[in-house]
């Protein structure tokens, strides 16, 4: 079984934010695979299904980004899974808008949602699918970063991200069916 967690903030006011591309990707993946987020469990909205022979659970934590680890920890215990069984879909400021990167482990890279997961589950050894949202500009400071990640995509950037979300959903399917090495070779830009 694989547990796929999309990171984001709950609520309609956040739905189009850069910080919510994890939720957006999971919604697309769920739709393409006929999975509904029809359950509330472990501080998350969840849905389950199968990809080939692999059972999967999709989860969107409803704790707000900075407390995502609480939901992930509960989900791991509920389904009796280990960190090696999870895939976290997240936004990444350090990647240009629309770029994808799959990797196992590593630091949180300043991402508070990932930091919360690492703290609450006690390891950084889980797969991440990062979707680039770009930096606000070369002069960024804390306030500009917050405004950027909580801002919505505009115009041309929205088109780039729509394409990236579609590719990220493909990357998830490849990751589940063919493994990290194959998916990384195919989708890391």
UniProtKB/Swiss-Prot annotation:
GO terms for cellular component: cytoplasm. GO terms for molecular function: peptidyl-tRNA hydrolase activity; tRNA binding. It catalyses: an N-acyl-L-alpha-aminoacyl-tRNA + H2O = an N-acyl-L-amino acid + a tRNA + H(+). Its EC number is 3.1.1.29. Disulfide bonds: none annotated. CDD domains: PTH. It comes from the Bacteria. GO terms for biological process: protein quality control for misfolded or incompletely synthesized proteins; rescue of stalled ribosome. Its main location: cytoplasm. It is an enzyme of class 3 (hydrolase). It is found in: Cytoplasm. The record marks 91 as: Stabilizes the basic form of H active site to accept a proton. TRNA binds at residues 14, 64, 66, 112. Coiled coil: none annotated. It holds the Pfam family Pept_tRNA_hydro. Keywords: Cytoplasm, Hydrolase, RNA-binding, tRNA-binding. The active site is at residue 19. The record marks 9 as: Discriminates between blocked and unblocked aminoacyl-tRNA. Monomer. Hydrolyzes ribosome-free peptidyl-tRNAs (with 1 or more amino acids incorporated), which drop off the ribosome during protein synthesis, or as a result of ribosome stalling. Belongs to the PTH family. This is Peptidyl-tRNA hydrolase. It comes from Dehalococcoides mccartyi (strain ATCC BAA-2100 / JCM 16839 / KCTC 5957 / BAV1).
